[in-house]
Amino acid sequence: MERLQKVIASSGVTSRRKAEELITAGKVKVNGEVVTELGTKVTDKDRIEVENVLIAKEVKEYYLLNKPRGVVTTTSDDKGRKTVVDLIPTNARIYPVGRLDYDTTGVLLLTNDGDFANILMHPASEVEKVYMAKLKGIIKGEHINALKDGVKLDDQIVKPSRVKLKKVDPKTNTCMVQITIHEGKNHQVKRMFESVGFEVLKLKREKEAFFDLKDLQSGEFRKLTPKEVAKVYGLQK
């Protein structure tokens, strides 16, 4: 269910603020009944009229993108940089589910379905996010143990569910480490490694929930299947 004013705005009829004004003015009907309360929630099955005109509901769209470097995870950018939304040709008002840093690559979901996005981002869903990080320096067991014990970020102790050293390159003094987290704090993975003394040179999200980058090259995307969408809704607690 979504708020009435959001559904009206999503249909393209007017802005959300104007939609709120129309609701309080008694110019909106839901299933033939005038509604004036802004907190009213509606479903896809409800019939909504604005000033006696039936609105066309926005069709829900769901995408999986292999985000490339040098693209911002927003719907617009005041610096004129390319956004993740620019990479997907659609008229739907899609937006990213969560965010990846400008130079971070990998799994990113986009949709215009607020409920779908909220399920994936809500802490109760405990969605796993798997990252591969290239670190400056060679991480040791003591550092991995320190991460597993938990590090303090934003006055909160956060712990990865898994940390694995995958590759060591003594010639370049770098290593590849796979780390799995549940939270989605700002710059979380980079800050976690920095807390134990390592700079992240490259970062890629390999997986989120059950979505991975199979058959998707950098910058490519695909639509989710109805089965995948239903599986996300099954995560709701």
What are these regions (language model features)?
Residues 1-237:
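Basic, flexible Lys/Arg- and Gly-enriched helix-loop patches that mediate nucleic-acid binding at interfaces
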